[in-house]
A protein has these predicted regions:
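Non-catalytic, hydrophobic alpha-helical segments
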Residues: 227, 231, 245, 256, ...
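NAD(P)-dependent short-chain dehydrogenase/reductase
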Residues: 132-138, 156, 160-236, 248-253, ...
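C-terminal amphipathic/interface module of NAD(P)-dependent oxidoreductases
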Residues: 288-330
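N-terminal Rossmann-like NAD(P)+-binding domain of SDR-like oxidoreductases, especially those catalyzing
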Residues: 1-181, 225, 235, 304, ...
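Residue-level signal for the nucleotide or nucleotide-sugar donor/cofactor binding architecture
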Residues: 60, 91, 99-102, 142, ...
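C-terminal "lid/loop" region of Rossmann-like NAD(P)-dependent oxidoreductases
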Residues: 210, 214, 241-243, 251-258, ...
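Short secondary-structure junction motifs
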Residues: 117, 173, 207, 240-242, ...
């Protein structure tokens, strides 16, 4: 039986990855940070709570990482923990750099000292590209990195230090350059769930409008279930590498709004307002990824479209108060 350690197991990706690994017979360990609301902190993994080993650790505290690694003795390590909200990174740039950037270095050094043969997945991000885009309109593994946010800068450091440790110490480290991926488990401060839940509240007459930022920004949105499958595939390869994980299809936030509101029988023009308060100091305008390498080399494929992903999110948001619907399985 393989043992896997997931940092940030209580996040969107961590919870789906834990489910996937359990289905494959893994012994799963997951780290969470201590905070003032431990019950809320484990909401996404409550349904598998008894099947995984939950431990407290923090990427900014190397001693806690060493302790967990010595206990778990993992064969595979998935580093998903981070301060992952781009807009928040402008308000908390130093913490973002420490947790998302230096935190990765703390983990790599801890692994090098305790279990250097373990295979490591690093959650890299399309935010590293910034507004750089190839002539054909896509971003891929060879596209120049030029981040436009503190979060993107921290992810570039993590990406580069992973490459450095792989080359310097022969460690099996793969960077997954993931484009935006969503689900019903996405945090409410991210635009997809903000739009979906905002629309549902309007239907229920719990809100009169929804205020958003730049509606023209476009993103390549996929489903988190598909993307954790890619993470696992990367660590099953004999040789580590870097891979873009994306659908190859881009939609604007206006597209997101239109589909969601019309699905619920609402006219978006009636309810949507915009405010510069929700725009970034430097905006990332366009993301669309080319995952040819991942698809051809590892056989990865998507099972959700933009529309079916949103359909699922709308269904769950609309049925959260319905006791006859088990929304935790989504």
């Amino acid at each position: 039986m393989k043992t896997a350690l997931i940092t940030g197991v209580n996040g969107q990706d961590g919870s789906y990855l834990a489910e996937l690994l359990l289905s494959k017979g893994y012994n799963v360990w997951g780290t969470i940070r201590r905070n003032s609301s431990p019950e809320y902190n484990t909401t996404r993994v409550d349904h598998i709570f008894e099947k995984i080993n939950l431990v407290y650790a923090d990427l900014t505290d190397m001693s806690s990482l060493v302790s967990v690694l010595q206990k778990a003795k993992p064969d595979e390590i998935y580093n998903l923990a981070a301060q992952s909200h781009v807009r928040v990174s402008f308000d908390a740039p130093i913490y973002t750099a420490e947790a998302t950037g230096l935190g990765t270095l703390n983990l790599l050094e801890s692994i090098r000292l305790t279990c250097p043969k373990a295979r490591i997945y690093q959650a890299s991000s399309s935010e590293m590209f910034g507004n750089n885009i190839d002539k054909d309109g896509y971003q891929r593994e060879t596209t120049q990195l030029s981040p436009v946010s503190p979060y993107g800068c921290a992810k570039v450091f993590s990406y580069n230090i992973c490459n450095n440790y792989r080359n310097s110490y022969g460690m099996h480290i793969s960077n997954g350059i993931l484009f935006n991926h969503e689900s019903p488990r996405r945090g409410m401060n991210f635009v997809t769930n903000k739009v979906v839940n905002g629309a549902v509240k309007i239907v229920r007459r719990e809100a009169e409008d929804l205020v958003l930022g730049n509606l023209a920004a476009s993103r390549d949105w996929g489903h988190a279930r598909d993307y954790v499958q890619a993470m696992w595939l990367m660590l099953q390869q004999d040789e580590p590498d870097n891979y873009v994980c994306a659908t190859g299809v881009s939609h604007t936030i206006q597209d997101l709004v239109d589909y969601t509101f019309k699905s619920l029988g609402l006219n978006p023009n009636t309810y949507i307002k915009t405010s510069q308060k929700f725009e970034r100091p430097e905006e990332l305008e366009h993301l669309k990824g080319d995952s040819t390498k991942l698809r051809t080399k590892l056989g990865w494929k998507t099972t959700y479209t933009f529309e079916t992903m949103l359909d699922e999110m709308i269904f769950v948001a609309s049925n959260k108060l319905n006791k006859d619907v088990d929304t935790k399985k989504f």
